[in-house]
């Protein structure tokens, strides 16, 4: 079995370059891997049921929960979280609330462990921007067009925890 952790390369395209496309699958681990109990198990066009079952067994062996996802740009987690992060940035850019108020509102109001802006900071604003641009190009949906504030922060070198400036 060839498993890839990519969230932007096509499992089907990778499989097409092998002689056993039925044995290629995506295992999308979310960051930080030790703390996140979820893995998206991504079926390419030719992924066999046997390969899928073995991948799910492997994920369980790691003590994680696997969810079946069919290949599509962004899978489930990335597709759903990016508009959320983007909208939080728009709220700050429009002066509706401070970053701290946005994160506190979402954490306490919805029982989240981390607010959307702190999450973007952990992921890295450059990565969030790259993912948004990829989904915007692939899907053409305006909800994935990066907020101007995100691009401004990146240009200023404020890309997140990894560089000490978010």
Outline where the language-model segments fall:
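Rossmann-fold dinucleotide-binding core
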Residues: 2-71, 75-79
